[in-house]
């Protein structure tokens, strides 16, 4: 069974609201709009210290009670972290030591193996869900390459493998959905996203092929990735398609 906090991903796809500014205010808004999980983007929030990160997580949990994913995305994968890699992974590991810390940690497959493994081990030791992610903002890899990337994520220790790609054609999007369904049929928990206007519909369609998470913005004019839709719109459309 794959869970993030109390949310059982085997029963329902979670709508994840991405918090990239005004963390407490926007977390409350996300809760009001029906978000199932919050992703706290430490890099976009400009949070660099364990003390400030811990304070934000405690405040949000106290006010919303919603499960939290924490990540600090590297520049190579579309994030704003500009410090040392060991400081970035050290920040995540420090948060995992909190009594009421994050419910899931997201670490990139492209992170150095030593640092990535440290984060994953710390999460496993504390029974915290591990998301291993990969983001390609330029293209969609060939079908078999996408399968290989996801398999590598599970070999690295992922509970959930997250793959975000940039489709350049309808065929690219179909290939991503094909891969999603293949891993669903194999009993694996994946999150797949086709970014940009070509893949915008996958935000609400991929869950029907097996994507266990779909990421959404708080407002339509403030998204963390190309093609992200607002939380309330995602919830509404997914309900209509059930």
From Swiss-Prot:
It catalyses: 3-dehydroquinate = 3-dehydroshikimate + H2O. Keywords: Amino-acid biosynthesis, Aromatic amino acid biosynthesis, Lyase, Schiff base. Its EC number is 4.2.1.10. 3-dehydroquinate binds at residues 39-41, 73, 203, 228. Pathway: Metabolic intermediate biosynthesis; chorismate biosynthesis; chorismate from D-erythrose 4-phosphate and phosphoenolpyruvate: step 3/7. The keyword Transit peptide does not apply. The active site is at 135 (proton donor/acceptor), 162 (schiff-base intermediate with substrate). InterPro entries: Aldolase_TIM (IPR013785), DHquinase_I (IPR001381), Type-I_3-dehydroquinase (IPR050146). Involved in the third step of the chorismate pathway, which leads to the biosynthesis of aromatic amino acids. Catalyzes the cis-dehydration of 3-dehydroquinate (DHQ) and introduces the first double bond of the aromatic ring to yield 3-dehydroshikimate. PANTHER family: 3-DEHYDROQUINATE DEHYDRATASE (PTHR43699:SF1). Homodimer. This is 3-dehydroquinate dehydratase.
């Amino acid at each position: 069974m794959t869970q993030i906090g109390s949310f059982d991903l085997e029963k329902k796809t979670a709508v994840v609201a991405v918090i990239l500014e005004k963390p407490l205010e926007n977390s409350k808004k996300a809760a009001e709009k029906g978000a199932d999980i919050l992703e706290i983007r430490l890099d976009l929030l400009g949070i660099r210290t364990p003390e400030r990160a811990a304070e934000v997580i405690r405040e949000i949990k106290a006010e919303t009670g919603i499960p939290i994913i924490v990540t600090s995305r590297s520049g190579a994968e579309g994030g704003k972290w500009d410090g040392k890699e060991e400081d970035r992974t050290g920040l995540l590991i420090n948060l995992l030591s909190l009594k009421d810390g994050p419910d899931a940690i997201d670490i990139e497959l492209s992170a150095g193996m030593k640092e990535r493994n440290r984060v994953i081990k710390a999460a496993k030791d504390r029974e915290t869900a591990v998301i291993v992610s990969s983001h390609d903002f330029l293209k969609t890899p060939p079908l078999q390459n996408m399968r290989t990337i996801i398999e590598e994520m599970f070999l690295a220790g992922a509970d959930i493998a997250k793959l975000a790609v940039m489709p350049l054609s309808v065929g690219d999007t179909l290939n991503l959905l094909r891969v999603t369904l293949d891993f669903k049929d194999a009993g694996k928990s994946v999150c797949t996203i086709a970014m940009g206007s070509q893949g915008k519909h996958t935000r609400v369609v991929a869950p029907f092929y097996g994507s266990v998470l779909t990421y959404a913005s708080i407002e339509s004019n403030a998204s963390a990735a190309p093609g992200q839709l607002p939380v309330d719109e995602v919830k509404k459309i997914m309900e209509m398609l059930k």
